[in-house]
């Protein structure tokens, strides 16, 4: 008793110190139904993106979709259930106007992040085509991203050569498929990434797409602080 033994109860609490705000800009043009990924480009992306979202517990995420125009699917939120539900509901025909407006998709994403006070602001922009629609030039949108301190990772999605893609509509409303050349403006995507301090990736199949999102996940790590508390229980009791 004179030695006054102590019993230590040690507990740990993790406190998030610096979260990241991430907007995923997704091309939803009809070509995203091409079957060079399984079962098609869009569904392959949704599966990989869902895993990515689940791996970011400390960050806020948002979704933007674009084809000939763009709009916000979900604003920045820490509610992963909401983001995953919105991701699952994305279809090629949610935006009626056809085409691929990369500049619009990027500009809308910048708009979602410009007021953010996060220590790191990131856009992951994915497309399977070339910029052929919209009234905002992709380079102008890139300059806006730089102005607001936003890094852009770009992903070109699609195999090399020809891909089985929608070429018309049948009377029953289903797409007719045919072999179509894969055309991705890689030079533009590389320029966007380089201008904003990000990286460009090319995904030619499902596994490569998964590897790319894993790589971005490693590059953009959330910083956390760990606090340890020690509670002492005095073994000695005075008489």
Q: Predicted regions: what is each one?
A:
Residues 1-12, 222-239:
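C-terminal signal-anchor/stop-transfer transmembrane helix together with its immediate cytosolic
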Residues 20, 58, 148-151, 196-198:
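Short glycine-/polar-rich loops that comprise or flank the Walker A/P-loop
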Residues 30-31, 68-72, 129-132, 158-162, ...:
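Solvent-exposed loop/turn segments at secondary-structure junctions
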